[in-house]
Amino acid sequence: MLQVREPSEHDIVTLMAELGRRGRAAARPLAVASTERKNAALLAMAEALEANTGRILAANKTDMEKGEAAGLSAAILDRLKLDEKRVRAIAEGIRAIADLDDPVGTVIAEWDRPNGLHIERVRTPLGVIGVIYESRPNVTADAGALCLKAGNAVILRGGSDSAASSAAIHSCLVEGLRKAGLPEDAIQRVPVTDREAVGEMLRGLGGNLDVIVPRGGRSLVERVQNEARVPVFAHLEGICHLYVDRSAKLDMAVALALNAKMRRTGVCGAAETLLVDRAVAGTHLVPILEALAAAGCEIRGGEDVRARFPSAISASEEDWRTEYLDAIISVKLVDGVFEAIEHIGTYSSHHTEAIVAEDPVAVQRFLNEIDSAILLHNASTQFADGGEFGMGAEIGIATGKMHARGPVGVEQLTSFKYRVHGSGQTRP
């Protein structure tokens, strides 16, 4: 019987180094590829995805069966699952990226110096991007398409949970590159699930990776942030808050709380903590919690919350620091917008926060004083998404302050350089 040998550590080092070299080689022609050629590749990818829907769903069925047998949580299985509607949405997302303006070559600013020099700041690709993700096969397409549009090569390392689905999707992306005459190595997929492959990416593949973007749970993101020797665009977790001010309209507060928590509980933009102004606890708190409970949400709160809503479970200090990714919400009464800001400043992961209010002073204070990547007024936290921002799609959400913050779309996947035009000037 043929024995299948797991790759050795030496094999993985060699494999990953080769992926890095090929990615760098592909990045050079990609950086100067025309918008028309990149868009042709994207449209061909979308067509290939739709034409191969049956093959993609068969691969996804294999992943789902393995995931169920392994006891994966409902939230992870939801992220992993594909159906015809989701595959169609992935294809439409790629078409939307093709419709976006090409950021490469855009003159961000220009000015003239007294000595006659004309200076331009121009957008350029980052180079080679590494994307490390878990049970999200759609990231294969989103990341590949976004990086291509921004003129970057990308190396994709999906989790073992989504290996078959990601491989099927990746083959469609390569088909699109081939049809458009672009290097097939512009979008590479790590073909092994050994974790040492991640380690090699974090070490930078011999200087051939320029940025790493992790998409996954806390343990993955922590490892990337702690070990990476190249810049990282990431958020550790999404502890998102919804604050209901004393000036909030009740019907709006109920609708936004319900959507922010329950539309999809497993996404990073789902609200995990509800803060309610104590001044409207008598009118707003119970209707909001009744709506959440009726939708199947578990309520956790302090004694003042439980006194008004006895079915609530007692909240601990740990609840304020927890990203549930489930139908659970922690609830706290606060003394106005100042205490809401203080609570968020203490417990937030700096991802997304929202205020429901009609008072412009409270709104401005909330938006100005909270240091999170995304702040919303009278809108659900679940709008924390690059597609909803008009970016076509996103490669992730970044909560850091260097280079990229918030949804990471095509513009955030570029850097810039200076072009200086002279007429023979020499420096005195």
Swiss-Prot record:
Single GO biological process annotation from the record: L-proline biosynthetic process
Catalyzed reaction equations: L-glutamate 5-semialdehyde + phosphate + NADP(+) = L-glutamyl 5-phosphate + NADPH + H(+)
EC number: 1.2.1.41
Localization per record: Cytoplasm
Predominant location category: cytoplasm
MF terms (GO), sorted A to Z: glutamate-5-semialdehyde dehydrogenase activity; NADP binding
Entry keyword annotation includes Amino-acid biosynthesis: yes
Pathway terms, separated by semicolons: Amino-acid biosynthesis; L-proline biosynthesis; L-glutamate 5-semialdehyde from L-glutamate: step 2/2
Matches recorded under Pfam families: Aldedh (PF00171)
InterPro entries attached to this UniProt entry: Ald_DH/histidinol_DH, Ald_DH_C, Ald_DH_N, Aldehyde_DH_dom, G-glutamylP_reductase_CS, Glu-5-SA_DH, GPR_dom
This protein's record includes keyword Oxidoreductase: yes
The entry's keywords: Amino-acid biosynthesis, Cytoplasm, NADP, Oxidoreductase, Proline biosynthesis
GO cellular component assignments: cytoplasm
The family this protein is said to belong to: Belongs to the gamma-glutamyl phosphate reductase family.
Role, per record: Catalyzes the NADPH-dependent reduction of L-glutamate 5-phosphate into L-glutamate 5-semialdehyde and phosphate. The product spontaneously undergoes cyclization to form 1-pyrroline-5-carboxylate.
HAMAP family on file: ProA
The protein's name: Gamma-glutamyl phosphate reductase
Species of the source: Chelativorans sp. (strain BNC1)
